[in-house]
Every structure is written in structure tokens, then in C-alpha cells.
């Protein structure tokens, strides 16, 4: 289980661009919408193998667990390594709030695993170069905080 890192991203600029960012963070997969992850189910590993879906069910027939394994039995954990290397965090954020503070200011607060998603925010800055972003993070478990 990770230490949760609180993040606050404030964007300043054109109202229409801010609405696009607001819509992105209203989705269930904002990080993937900003910086898409490869389609691992259809991406062969270094041995040319595709992962196979493995599911386990509860006694009532509902899905308990699902994962992807290679024919060798090894779990396909490429998603994890890719996220840490590219997003700088393990998975999608837990969005806490989206607040339009003024017609030209949008504030988004969310939690991430362990660290701020600097890679995602770098992509967001690339996609919206006309906006200004101020980003704050606080990870109290290791007592680190800052701006980027």
C-alpha cells in the first residue's frame, strides 16, 4: 500500500482550454487521457508472447480478481513499470475536487501513490502551452513537499 501524496494543480489561462482540462479530470482515467499507456493486452513481451487474461470469481459468481499472465505464468507487470517511469506514480489519481475559481483559473486536487505525477503534468504543459500551471504536492509519510 502506498503513501498517499496530495497534489494541487492550478491552471491559469483561456477559459475554453481550462474547460478541456476540467473534462479530462472528470473522467475515470485522466492520466491515461493526458499521457496514454500502451495497450499491454496487444503488446508482445520480449519473447513475443501476448498476456492471457486470468480471472477468479467469488462463490456468487461475481468477479473477485483479474490479471494478465504470460504463458510461462509470469504476471504481466509492464503497466506498473511504465507508469512509474512515465507518470512518476503507480496508477490513476484519486480526484478529490475540481474547482473553477474564476473564469481564468481552475484548481484540481487529487491523491497519487507515493509521489507527484510530474510526467503527466509535463505532458499536460506540452498539450496546453498557452496555459500556466502551478503544482504543489505534499507526501506526509516521508515528509516531502514542494512545487514543480
Set out the residue ranges of the language-model regions.
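Long, contiguous binding/interaction regions
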Residues: 1-148
